[in-house]
Amino acid sequence: KIALSTPVELENDFPITFQLQNSAPIVERVDFKPSFTENIYFVYLNKKQSSKASIEKYLNRQQDISEVVSEIETITKLTIETNNFPVFSKAIEKHEAIMSAVLEMETVKQKYFNDFNGTVKSLGAWGGDFVMVLSEENPKEYFKQKGFETILTYEEMIL
């Protein structure tokens, strides 16, 4: 089980990074103001899943993830620092592929949106309520045709 040694505020009005070091939460505020916010969307899937159940399932596997953690840290740093949309998109795709392998689950794009021309990133419990969508073109019509009506721009989401 993951037990935090100190309470941590998990809701914030600003971007953060979060990690555990020796069961202690490390929360850092980050400056995330990419020049390509018009290419970032959030789609509500209405497929609520339990993060707790996903975490427990993962923890029962007893995998050594030190290499994965290092790779994820590198990707996180890149996504925070880059102002290049294709670089950001590729980094997000790499993160999603790594998590897919670790969790032994197909990505949300593979499962629901394999014909989408862009990036789809699971948020929260994999395949849960929201996904982040990265696209050169407005993807709202695509997702509406798939039956998803709630599509928010980056600006709408961060209000």
Where are these regions (language model features)?
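C-terminal nucleotide
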Residues: 2-125, 132-159
